[in-house]
Amino acid sequence: MFIEGRFYNARMKSPAVESLTGVFDYGHGISAVDSVYDREMQTAIHLLIEEGRAAVIDTGTSHAAPRVLAALAAKGVAPERVDYVILTHVHLDHAGGAGQLMAHFPNARLTVHPRGARHVIDPGRLLAATVAIYGEAETRRVYGKILPVPAHRVIETPEGATLRLAGRELLFLDAPGHARHHVVIRDAKSGHVFAGDTFGLSYRELDQDGRQFSFPTTSPSQFDPAALHHSIDRMLSLGPEAIYATHFGRLTNLAVLAADLHRLIIAHAELGERHRGAGARRKRLLTEGVSELVLAERERQKWRFPREKVLEVFALDIELNAQGLESWLDSEGK
């Protein structure tokens, strides 16, 4: 079940030059549009522009479409000059707005991992599963109207696939660990990598004196610690100076962040193993354990925010990570 959502609010400061409200320019024709997914600077939609042609990397929810259109217009890119809508994976905070945006971009093709293609062509299963958890009204409030993408406009991007944006080569690499339908994209011109959720969560409001952090997301239902370790190492082996995370934006000092991710993935897996046989108490123990990992990271990173604020920022991530550990333990037992 490919579901992910975040429902809390906070205020954050910009990690880059804010050229338009909620749009952050990183150079190399790369920028981030804040989708304002129930809070500022929590979920990014990345734009890649080359010679007046554009690719949109992840879409946010349907509510974010006007923000993307406004950002493109401000950069002088007409809707018919958008060549690609690129999905790192099909969790709804990354792909829920795909159908809406494709309706605005008459010449665009949508790219997606082969395992995710059927879910953008017919999002009924995704939608039904989300409604079953949140209810119809809350699903509509958070995600808006989820539209299908016509099959003839969908390109599957398996391991090693390449596309060109006005001659600028994009390389797609299979990146399981967070989800089996996940890709990361290397931009040949900048040498940078678009990581989706594979390089974790990194919220700018918690940056300490400009020092970034990264915390893994193990949300259900396809967390695979061994695969995630491998995907992180593979991204670093490409030698990027920067990685772009959907949650949120440009990350540097990558070796340090990767070491933190590896350490925390191990800690999550150990937490799961410790409570594997806890029965009805397992969900509560996992949730408490993830909370403890977050608070330990607060001490390690020397975040100035009080414990209550840090737990508020990570509230749904704690819940999702605990759910993902449960799914992982259940799947390992089959």
Locate predicted features.
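N-terminal amphipathic/basic-hydrophobic helices that include classical n-h-c signal peptides
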Residues: 1-11
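Metallo-beta-lactamase
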Residues: 15, 61-63, 120-174, 180-244, 248-252
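Conserved beta-strand hairpin/beta-sheet module of binuclear metal-dependent hydrolase folds
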Residues: 16-75, 185-197, 201
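Residue-level marker for buried hydrophobic side chains located in beta-strands
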Residues: 55-57, 86, 110, 192-194, ...
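Active-site metal-binding motif and surrounding structural segment of the metallo-beta-lactamase
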Residues: 66-112
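Active-site/pore-lining binding-face segments in mid-to-C-terminal subdomains
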Residues: 226, 231-290
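C-terminal regulatory/interaction regions
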Residues: 270-334
